[in-house]
Amino acid sequence: MTTSRFATFDIESETGLTPGAYPAPLPTLEQQLHDRNAILAAIPSLARAKLDAATLKRRFANFLLTLGMVGTTSKGSYEELIIPPVKGMGSSTGFRARELVQIITSSPAPPGFDGNQTLRQFARPYAPQVQNMIAQGKFKTNLYDKYGKSVGAPPHVCIDFNDAMDLQMFHSTAEFESAHKVRELAIAEASARENAPRPAANPRAAKPIIGQTAPAFHSGDAAKQSGGQPVNIKPSLAQSAGFDSHRPPPETPPRAGTPSSQKSGQSGQTTIQPPASHGILSGMLGSHKSTPHSSPQQTPKK
């Protein structure tokens, strides 16, 4: 019986395979992506659709959990094997099972390998092919970009979260479970950010459109700035006169001795001059034509 480099798992007793030399040259892309059923047939003990967490921890702890031969559902449970790829995980990495079988069955183990080192040294020969396949669009990288970094997976060999699980060595099943919790938290946080309600636009912060007339402040009004402090607005000249362009001028009785009360030498009647049609400026210029903003001229009451 050949002792596996993983202390809790024996290759021959579980797979029926005899350790052999690592193939050289590297298998071609077509060979790696060949019929997955052949892989399942070569590893009878792994060719089961579902395994509960207890079985995985008991029988395949260091083998499956460290090599990532098990996928997770959206709830994070150890439910399905990665051979073939887990449905819904967005993984097209079923070929990796062939690589791992070749790695595991290679002999002898590297000197000093104690089962707690990363598998980066074993995956490195495949890195050029992995990068080449990424360039060909064979893999999706979004899962790794979002979640793979949370478990410290090496980016040059990891192309999605399944790869992060495949190529990251954990010291214990507890460490593996902790990494899954980190992943679930990352998924939850990303989902919360995507589904968070957008803050409503602040109407006070909106800038006026070019050409739009800003509302005038009337005498005695107080505008609040962003700090919430009231600001006394100085009334304009028109407001000082008692009216502005937004309010019709009030009817004021004429006072004797004022310029607005003049006696006509011909009729002897008192006539009331209407106020300027467009504020003080128009009155100074002597313009009495009505404008869109002017109030209707008042005629003397008989």
From Swiss-Prot:
Locate the region Disordered. 217-302
Which residues lie in Polar residues bias regions? 288-302
The record describes the protein's role as:
Capsid protein self-assembles to form a flexuous, filamentous capsid (Potential). The capsid encapsulates the single-stranded RNA genome.
Please give the superkingdom of this protein's source: Viruses
Species, as recorded: Botrytis virus F (isolate Botrytis cinerea/New Zealand/Howitt/2001)
Quote the cellular component terms of the Gene Ontology held in the record. Answer: helical viral capsid
The entry's localization annotation reads: Virion
Protein name (Swiss-Prot/TrEMBL): Capsid protein
Q: Which residues cross the membrane?
A: none
Q: What is its main location?
A: virion
Alphabetical UniProt keywords: Capsid protein, Helical capsid protein, Virion
Q: Where is the composition biased (Low complexity)?
A: 254-271
